[in-house]
Design a protein with these regions (language model features):
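Short beta-strand segments of immunoglobulin-like
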Residues: 283-290
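Short beta-strand and strand-turn-strand segments in soluble, beta-rich domains
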Residues: 277-280, 321-335
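Short beta-strand elements
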Residues: 374-385
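Surface-facing alpha-helical segments and adjacent helix-coil boundary elements at the starts of domains
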Residues: 2-266, 290, 307
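Short glycine/proline/serine/threonine-rich loop/turn segments at secondary-structure transition edges
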Residues: 354-364
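Beta-strand-rich binding/interaction modules
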Residues: 293-302, 306-321
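Proline/serine/threonine-rich low-complexity linkers at boundaries of modular beta-sandwich domains
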Residues: 265-279
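A beta-strand/beta-hairpin structural motif
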Residues: 297, 328-355, 383
């Protein structure tokens, strides 16, 4: 059986069709045989063979990963107690039995447990909130919890504030990850995009969390907030600055969108200014690029100050879109300290290989270098088929 973990492979950020094909195969005959046996050991009336037959009835082979997961939830429900609290109690027993059989936490295959709560527990707040605490210690509930935030709003957020103080790091992470206004590949939470102040106590409680796994979630939550409410993140950056190396790390990662945007206040916060940082010999070596090949460019950078300077170095590709306009995408090169009068030469390649997450359009594109948030002259290149 595949043992793919959410902590090392976030399925919702994977774009390769080859990898997605592999992931859907975690739902195999072997998996359902072993899972069915684990259920039967704690649920005497469970008919393992009927369960497996129901799983494979119809077009299972044609289903992709998410559809297989959802299908598993629906079929499992047919074999569970129809009383929701009783079903949740049974899920807890199944999970404990899986742990005894050496299934460790964050095994992606079992995400249907979280999905079960989302699908069948939305009208039972108390039971579901308790279920999330137990299930997320085995498999993340960050996606399943979001409909509850939308429906119950502050009541759910109050629960999540409690979770942020929980002894288990998976539960603490759920309080942050589940309340992100813009969690990728999940439904957005409009009222938190508009005003995220209700979730700030969660982030405050977690800013010094001993788990990097949790702190990374706090940073991602802040980055979500920054996209709609930059001033809130700027104020938090000032408030948390220098509290600890970990907190400084959270702020730096949480402000990454603001840094890419060249937001003046966050650049000032980090002492990033471009005076006397000279760009020269900026050249596109491949002015005509074929889709599938690389754009190649080079430039020199010289710190002409009499003191060392931190330089955040980026470049922007202005992609031509379907309607003819250009859309800017910023890529980070480095952020490091340059000594007085230090000169460096930079050579870079930018891929135009076909990927599932970007559609390329032939025609004139643009390229620029960004030094501490300040964009340089813009050069053009042509993309051809």
């Amino acid at each position: 059986m595949f043992n793919i973990k959410l902590e090392t492979l976030n399925i919702f950020e994977v774009h390769s069709n080859k990898i997605m094909g592999l992931i859907k195969d975690i739902y195999s005959v072997t998996f359902y045989e072993k899972f069915g046996q684990a259920v039967a050991e704690v649920h005497p009336t469970f008919d393992k063979q009927k369960f497996i037959d129901a799983i494979y009835k119809g077009d299972f082979a044609q289903k992709e990963w998410k559809d297989r997961m959802k299908h598993t939830t629906v079929v499992l429900h047919q074999f569970m107690p129809q009383n929701f609290p009783e079903a949740v109690a049974l899920i807890d027993k199944i999970i404990e039995n899986l742990k005894k059989n050496n299934y460790t936490d964050s095994n992606l295959a079992f995400i249907f447990f979280a999905d079960y709560i989302e699908m069948y527990g939305l009208d039972d707040f108390k039971t579901s909130a308790k279920a999330f605490v137990s299930i997320t210690q085995f498999i993340s509930c960050e996606f399943a919890v979001r409909p509850f935030v939308l429906k119950y709003k502050q009541e759910m957020i109050n629960e999540m504030i409690k979770w942020s103080l929980h002894e288990n790091h998976h539960v603490r992470r759920l309080s942050s990850e589940g309340s992100r206004p813009r969690l990728p590949w999940a439904m957005a939470i409009p009222f938190l995009k508009k005003d995220p102040t209700s979730i700030l106590p969660i982030l405050e409680n977690l800013k010094n969390d001993p788990s990097e796994y949790v702190r990374r979630s706090v940073a991602n939550n802040l980055n979500d907030i920054a996209k709609d409410n930059p001033q809130i993140v700027l104020e938090i950056a000032k408030k948390w600055r220098g509290k600890s190396p970990e907190t400084d790390g959270i702020i730096k990662h949480g402000a990454r969108t603001l840094l890419k945007q060249g937001h003046p206040e966050i650049l000032s916060h980090y002492g990033l200014e471009s005076t006397n940082i000279e760009l020269s010999n900026f050249e596109i070596k491949t002015p005509v690029v074929k889709i599938g090949d690389y754009l190649q460019f080079q430039f020199d950078l010289n710190n002409k100050n009499n003191e060392a300077k931190t330089v955040r170095l980026e470049y922007a590709v202005h992609y031509k879109k379907a309607k003819g306009h250009l859309a800017k995408k910023v890529f980070k090169i480095s952020e490091k300290t340059y000594q007085p009068n230090q000169l460096i030469k930079v050579d870079r390649n930018q891929s135009f290989k076909i990927i599932t997450t970007r559609v390329f359009h032939t025609g004139i594109h643009q390229l620029s270098i960004i030094i501490n948030g300040t964009e340089s002259e813009v050069l053009e290149f042509e993309l051809i088929s």
